[in-house]
Structure formats: C-alpha cells, structure tokens
C-alpha cells in the first residue's frame, strides 16, 4: 500500500478526536485561532532505497497542543493531554480507498515550550516503487518476435 501524507494526518486527527473536541489544524496557521487547539506539523524525515524496488521513508510529525496563556490549571491540562496521546497513539488508522490498516508509531517523545506541549512521533513506511517498463527491453522483444515470423 502506498502512503499519503494527508491520510496519515487524518488518521492522527481521528485518534486525537477520540479524547478531545478541540480544533485540529494541519499546520501553524496565519489566521487567528482560539486556544486550546492542536497543530499537526510535518518535520524533516528521510528516504532511502531498499531492495526489491522499494524505498523506506521516515515520516516525522510534531503534534503541538496550544493552550490559552496564564490559565490556572495549565500543567494539569498538559499532562492530561500527554497521557491521552500516549494511550491513543500506539497505532494510527490509515485508509486509502477501500483499504484500511494501522500504522505503528515509533520514537514518541515530548517536551514543553512555554507551556505548549510538543509531542513528536515517527512513522516508518516501506513503499514499493511503481515499475517503469524499460523501452529497450520491449524493443528487443519486438525484434525477437519478428525473427520468429
């Protein structure tokens, strides 16, 4: 199954919506947003070739939970969200067309920055490259057919 970044982000948003009704945005927005809310930010990853016409892709995502500044129970809110993310993000649902599967989440870590929670995850996918027919090979096949006739 090939992957789509938007389908991966949708799967993460689906998991977050199981425990929170806060708005979820795909990336930091220039528009005015009302905290508390979540942002799903893509971080640098990597791609490397593998055998059997496949490649291995690292997808890194930073899930940012923003909360209103100077609230009384800010620490409690952050740790509640952190616990929920830890419980819900072992795997994420992934659907392309009629196919649904689960993707395992790796390298989960978090840190606080100005009382905003950054929960970083990694996904590892192996993707089969689309096969491109070599034109020379097909030309050789045509020549062999002509010789046999």
Q: What are these model-predicted stretches?
A:
Residues 1-25, 46-149:
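Charged, amphipathic alpha-helical segments and their flanking helix caps
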Residues 34-43:
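A short, hydrophobic beta-strand-centered structural micro-motif
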């Amino acid at each position: 199954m090939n992957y789509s970044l938007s389908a991966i982000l949708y799967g993460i948003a689906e998991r977050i919506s199981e425990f929170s009704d806060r708005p979820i945005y795909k990336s930091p927005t220039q528009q005015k947003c009302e905290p508390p809310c979540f942002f799903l930010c893509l971080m640098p990853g990597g791609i490397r070739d593998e055998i059997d016409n496949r490649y291995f892709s690292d997808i890194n995502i930073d899930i940012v939970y923003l909360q209103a500044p100077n609230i009384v129970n800010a620490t409690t809110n952050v740790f509640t969200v952190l616990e929920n993310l830890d419980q819900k993000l072992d795997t994420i649902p992934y659907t392309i067309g009629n196919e649904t599967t689960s993707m395992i989440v790796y390298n989960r870590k978090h840190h606080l920055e100005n009382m905003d929670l950054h929960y970083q995850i990694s996904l590892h996918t192996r993707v089969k490259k689309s096969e491109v027919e070599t034109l020379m090979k097909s030309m050789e096949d045509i020549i062999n057919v002509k010789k046999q006739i």
